[in-house]
């Protein structure tokens, strides 16, 4: 039908519209074809989480590795490229959280590290380390939702970007922070 064809053509024009360019390829896999985004930091994860943090003005942001669905080639970036990376209809959201909630969030997000896990966090505005020799002590309910950390934490050395100085400073567990992410 002509009406449907016209709608498809309009969406194709929008999708092919250039919105930026990159001199580097944004990766989801290594050169051997091993998926990285679910257990390693990648430039695609950094780019996406940095964009969320900057666009929302949040203190920090995250994109889970399971939500990064496609790489982006170097050169022109179009809406279709962004739709390929994020094919879901998720909305960007922000929330005020305590430093302790962030620590628990990170603990849950890396509970299966170094194994692949869609919850692996690509962060902006936060740095942290993981001691993978410590077994996870995260407890979840029957639906897989976080209940508590019942033992040693694997996550340590959590630092937050100070917007004024541009330096990373130790996280205050009692402090309040604005976190940006998706509402999936």
Regions found by a protein language model. Name each.
Residues 1-21, 127-134, 139-145:
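Binuclear metal-dependent phosphoesterase catalytic core
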Residues 3, 7, 29, 33, ...:
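Generic alpha-helix detector with strongest preference for long hydrophobic helices that associate
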Residues 18-41:
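Glycine-rich phosphate/diphosphate-binding loops and the adjacent beta-loop-alpha structural elements
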Residues 42, 46-184:
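Feature captures C-terminal
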